[in-house]
């Protein structure tokens, strides 16, 4: 390779990232117009398009580099010099952290995810930690209640860029003040003030005002979801002011926000104060920088691994028929490997399973499907793997494992947030907790279905319970669109003997689903059956599912709320 080519390659990669993030911001900047026009299908399509941008631009850069190098092989010293030149370009670069991830992605695409060493990649950042502790330009505006909170909130709402008419601005402000007074008390509220992000956070059918409620005793989240009536008038649906509520709004089971963030590291740093339980990876994920979130997630894993003496073990719960799942006992994530061979009743391919996981990545997850990060050629030290898990890996996924002596390489896996399997949770709880779990499970099914997702396998073992008590679906190998399913009633038996026969007396085609059968496995436990019949009996009727299908086919997009119905102002104060 001729000398001097290293700088050209480094500049080409950074220019490629500039192009990618420019398109990312362009798609994001259209969120306000899509919201104001109530073009919910365009909202969904923009979300998919934005997710695809990253890989598309990585591919473009890879093709450019192959042209620049004429396809010649590169030696280790050349690659090190490329990284050195790239690193020198970053100190004054505003999106340095994601630029490093983009470099990693280009390298992995060129070299098939091999030789992933700190010398060649940005395994950890080259820049000072939390470089944007001091924000280089204001991300938020302060509002003080000099003339009372009604006046303050009127200024906040009047400053919003939204161009639609408000249904009843004074009413909404009254509800917010009432909530704040009940939460803080009159004296504390009088001594508090607001800091509000300059940009709205758009997701699904809502525009979120995100702020900080700065009180004498500390800083709280201040979140206002703004919705539209059927007549296109704006209203504020609730006010959320606890870290637990904010954590759910920014949760790992939800779609990414569309928020205009030319300085993503600064925005993440600003959000950290009101989302103290979120990792850096989760914060980047929430604002749509999912590829850099993957980088941060891997860094968090490495830091945890360096500081513990644990070994990987098989994850608790019923062993899956498609996935082998393992974890570190104290780590909050699980690792999922597609098995070489599936159980006989699972008539599908590994490619189908991967397609299902990609569907979930791109779809509106409505707070009920866990996000995943996908890795190739994932290296594990053998000393970190328990003997039982090593035997299981070799038994179930040997075709995906390469033995390097002291290490193994797993060709492909997913990393996902760890939860308590719902079947285990139901065994451990009783009373109100049991009732809440069954209510949550049914609500999860309903919300997935309304978003055009049919889970396929609805057994409790395929769902998990989060630290906030929410029920989330995490087993995607049988997932499909609601509109692809044929929901049928079981025909009446022709003769009494039909009900005793080992085979059904009616024909069953691929795609046929009989909701009446759900009762057999969801209500078998005498503690659970009555609760299910009380709260979710309609899930056992085919006409319920067909009615949902009709709404989806008619183009209806359901509202998705990241909070309980009882928290809505229309329920709470009316």
From Swiss-Prot:
One of its GO terms (biological process) is glyoxylate cycle. It is found in: Cytoplasm. Its main location: cytoplasm. InterPro entries: AceK_kinase, AceK_regulatory, Isocitrate_DH_AceK. It holds the Pfam family AceK_regulatory. GO terms for cellular component: cytoplasm. One of its GO terms (molecular function) is protein serine/threonine kinase activity. Its EC number is 2.7.11.5, 3.1.3.-. ATP binds at residues 315-321, 336. It catalyses: L-seryl-[isocitrate dehydrogenase] + ATP = O-phospho-L-seryl-[isocitrate dehydrogenase] + ADP + H(+). Transmembrane segments: none annotated. It comes from the Bacteria. The active site is at 371. Keywords: ATP-binding, Cytoplasm, Glyoxylate bypass, Hydrolase, Kinase, Nucleotide-binding, Protein phosphatase, Serine/threonine-protein kinase, Transferase, Tricarboxylic acid cycle. PANTHER family: ISOCITRATE DEHYDROGENASE KINASE_PHOSPHATASE, PTHR39559. Belongs to the AceK family. Bifunctional enzyme which can phosphorylate or dephosphorylate isocitrate dehydrogenase (IDH) on a specific serine residue. This is a regulatory mechanism which enables bacteria to bypass the Krebs cycle via the glyoxylate shunt in response to the source of carbon. When bacteria are grown on glucose, IDH is fully active and unphosphorylated, but when grown on acetate or ethanol, the activity of IDH declines drastically concomitant with its phosphorylation. This is Isocitrate dehydrogenase kinase/phosphatase. It comes from Escherichia coli O127:H6 (strain E2348/69 / EPEC).
